[in-house]
Amino acid sequence: MLGKGGKRKFDEHEDGLEGKIVSPCDGPSKVSYTLQRQTIFNISLMKLYNHRPLTEPSLQKTVLINNMLRRIQEELKQEGSLRPMFTPSSQPTTEPSDSYREAPPAFSHLASPSSHPCDLGSTTPLEACLTPASLLEDDDDTFCTSQAMQPTAPTKLSPPALLPEKDSFSSALDEIEELCPTSTSTEAATAATDSVKGTSSEAGTQKLDGPQESRADDSKLMDSLPGNFEITTSTGFLTDLTLDDILFADIDTSMYDFDPCTSSSGTASKMAPVSADDLLKTLAPYSSQPVTPSQPFKMDLTELDHIMEVLVGS
């Protein structure tokens, strides 16, 4: 390998790296040529993808490496090789420079100790060890995926055991019946629980029973329920109760009743009673006419009609 800063020179009689494509006829010469080509290919990939993080890659070196990869690709096309698999070759005897002592991490998972790319005893062709440069330029992941030498048989996945639809449907019915049970759906609830515990045929026979048996089951179900649960099973649920009884049953509103006109007996014990004379005295400064304490506290309907006409007219 050339040192850092050294120029690459081409020898016309050298079997080749960048010149004419040599097609050797003998077996050992072909193996040596394939070894050289594989070594150059690996070194080119290493230089192309292993850059220092703080230095920018040189454009001239990148162009030379890409040209070398294109030449190897043209040779592979002329030889008619199929899509090869990339495997790193044996390390050269000369120690590389400091920049390329370690292999790039992108190709670390591709090293296979069992097979050598240019083993003489292997039955695979020698060109199958090389990867075209077009695959490298198009997608970096295509040449990183190594194909297995002996594909393993696909494992047969056992299909998951599917539960019958009736069981899931009956369990859903059970949940619904627990949330909102009614007297009309007790027959369906008993049939659903029986279908979960027993077979589907037994559930079908129970659904086809007469109305007398269903009424007997309803009575047994109502007897088995606790006393506080009987309120929820009635069809007239919340008909006798009002919203105030439910929401404001635990709230003592006697402390918050400040209206003197609507004071009840409970408020009279806690608040001082307000007479009509005191109320008229407090309302006297806001009235246009003088109000006497003996005047009855009432509203005239004609004044209300006049006020409504004024409001509608405005």
Swiss-Prot record:
Impact upon substituting L238A: Abolishes the interaction with XPO1 as well as the nuclear export and the subsequent proteasomal degradation
Annotated SERTA domain residues: 33-80
Keyword Nucleus tagged: yes
Biased composition annotated in UniProt, kind: Polar residues: 87-97
Subcellular locations according to the entry: Nucleus; Cytoplasm
Basic and acidic residues bias locations: 210-221
Superkingdom of the organism of origin: Eukaryota
InterPro entries recorded: E2F-SERTA_domain_protein, SERTA_dom
Subunit description: Interacts with XPO1; which mediates nuclear export. Interacts with TFDP1; modulates transactivation activity of TFDP1/E2F complexes.
Listed name of the protein: SERTA domain-containing protein 2
Species of the source: Homo sapiens
Source organism phylogeny: Eukaryota, Metazoa, Chordata, Craniata, Vertebrata
